Amino acid sequence: MFRRLLIATVVGILAAFAVAGFRHAMLLLEWLFLNNDSGSLVNAATNLSPWRRLLTPALGGLAAGLLLMGWQKFTQQRPHAPTDYMEALQTDGQFDYAASLVKSLASLLVVTSGSAIGREGAMILLAALAASCFAQRFTPRQEWKLWIACGAAAGMAAAYRAPLAGSLFIAEVLFGTMMLASLGPVIISAVVALLVSNLINHSDALLYSVQLSVTVQARDYALIISTGVLAGLCGPLLLTLMNACHRGFVSLKLAPPWQLALGGLIVGLLSLFTPAVWGNGYSTVQSFLTAPPLLMIIAGIFLCKLFAVLASSGSGAPGGVFTPTLFIGLAIGMLYGRSLGLWFPDGEEITLLLGLTGMATLLAATTHAPIMSTLMICEMTGEYQLLPGLLIACVIASVISRTLHRDSIYRQHTAKHS
């Protein structure tokens, strides 16, 4: 047991450095090509001329597509081993390391050029890769899946500063690939990754800064639960739209570079209306949480961002949709809150409360992981007073979504790439 805890600690350290490496590579490319040192792609887009704002995501998609197509031609065959940690956990616990690194580099290109796709997917993949590489060298074969799971959880903890949610991500989303009794090493890896990440970044701040002064009462619980019902209906719709967009891009029968370039061009066109569509949505979420906009502004940014996410994910841009889903949930919750705020004197607090609820419940509706989704929002914002209400709402959202749409976003992703 002591040996496993020691290895879990090493995996956590490796994962933290893998995440930090990807993050610093992003910052370097943004500084080189966008003259942006703020770390915010929305700020970068705001400072660009309209034509550069239009073309940059398309050029990034084109470069990523050329890289992926070039690698396919170089290998002359599909890789025998997976390039995704979920696939690796469902098979024999092995990666195609070279192909996975190429995929991560392609993700780096599309993320730093403004595509509306999550950077955290590549971070978690690199963390799992680092764990797998270490495991194959120093541990027996039957433990490889466990250490990949530890790496994925640690990567999630370092990326989102949410070690408990990262651990439960393994238990809920990847349930069946490992025993719950093995969660001890997973939790150790996640916590160590968070601590090392804090040391690297010289900060232990929460991912999102929220000033929620409301004390949750009976009325608020009713509003939270009703938001869960709304998210349970919206989750399957979002998954259906993503699947339809992917099929639409595939039906065009474009070569990968042109398909990714088209997705990037759509993002560029949308960014002419609002630069908030650039990136994974982190900075937009923070600005909404700091000062919730008016209803029409939320609606406009929401529609543009939704189309940008659909274009990016549908075109096959390598990256995650976890953080974009958080923004979509926030916007849905805030739109609902703004509508209800007309009837209550404390409309601003209701809007913020239901925005946070929307983040958790839409995440639960798309991942079918209510406990992880609840803890994720609490850990990212520090608003643990919301935990009881969010847990009920997330369970409701997950049940409704699972009834209407059998597959979660991760099962849908695996089926799409199998």
Swiss-Prot record:
Subcellular localization, as worded in the UniProt entry: Cell inner membrane
Claim: tRNA-binding is one of the keywords in the record: no
Record's bilayer topology term: Multi-pass membrane protein
Domain of life from the UniProt record: Bacteria
Chief place of localization: membrane
Entry similarity comment: Belongs to the chloride channel (TC 2.A.49) family. ClcB subfamily.
HAMAP family: CLC_ClcB
Protein name, UniProt field: Voltage-gated ClC-type chloride channel ClcB
Gene assigned in the entry: clcB
